[in-house]
């Protein structure tokens, strides 16, 4: 959202550049909102402007096509990967997430649930993913594919719990709720 207009666009780009130069891990979710942009073309260009600085990226299937011009989200994920990120997660709503690195590509299925409101599902997924990612206390390059898949499973669990309730923020589950859900579902 901060890439939609100046001065936040320049500030975001500069912050990402400085963070990258300092060795920080850069996570990116373009969070495309059509009404905030003058055109779809401007949105695509603006959102693509920071991809080369990104280490881990989450996009929806729609965003992946918009940012790359590809016709499938699988091809789009590979094109995004070629632009800089080391890991791309393409969220697919109730179908789960496609997780792609240079060495791996795997569909991580969603947990089946009765969706009441999908507001916040993508943000919840990414928050859950990043929370699990950070819990490993490892550099991205040191993580195994199974650990990265576990991050996606956790993200899917958070999103699954989120869509069961109304409202984006009130529906976000606690860490204890997520862990209990994972324990009961995966046990």
Give residue ranges: language-model regions:
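Conserved beta-alpha-beta core of the PfkB/ribokinase-like small-molecule kinase fold
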Residues: 2-79, 85-86, 95-96
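Conserved phosphate-binding/catalytic region of the ribokinase-like
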Residues: 17-21, 69-187
């Amino acid at each position: 959202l901060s890439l939609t207009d100046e001065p936040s666009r320049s500030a975001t780009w500069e912050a990402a550049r400085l963070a990258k130069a300092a060795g920080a891990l850069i996570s990116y979710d373009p969070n495309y909102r059509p009404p905030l942009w003058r055109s779809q073309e401007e949105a695509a260009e603006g959102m693509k402007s920071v991809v080369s600085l990104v280490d881990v990226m989450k996009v929806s299937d729609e965003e992946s096509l918009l940012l790359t011009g590809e016709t499938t989200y699988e091809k789009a994920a590979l094109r995004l990967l070629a632009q800089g990120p080391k890991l791309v997660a393409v969220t697919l709503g109730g179908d789960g997430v496609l997780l792609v690195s240079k060495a791996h590509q795997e569909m991580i299925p969603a947990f089946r649930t009765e969706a009441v409101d999908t507001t916040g599902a993508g943000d919840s997924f990414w928050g859950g993913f990043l929370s699990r990612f950070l819990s490993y206390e490892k550099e991205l390059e040191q993580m195994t594919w199974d650990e990265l898949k576990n991050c996606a499973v956790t993200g899917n669990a958070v999103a699954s719990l989120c869509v069961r309730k109304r409202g984006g923020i009130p529906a976000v589950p606690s860490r204890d709720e997520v862990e209990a859900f994972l324990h009961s579902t995966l046990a």
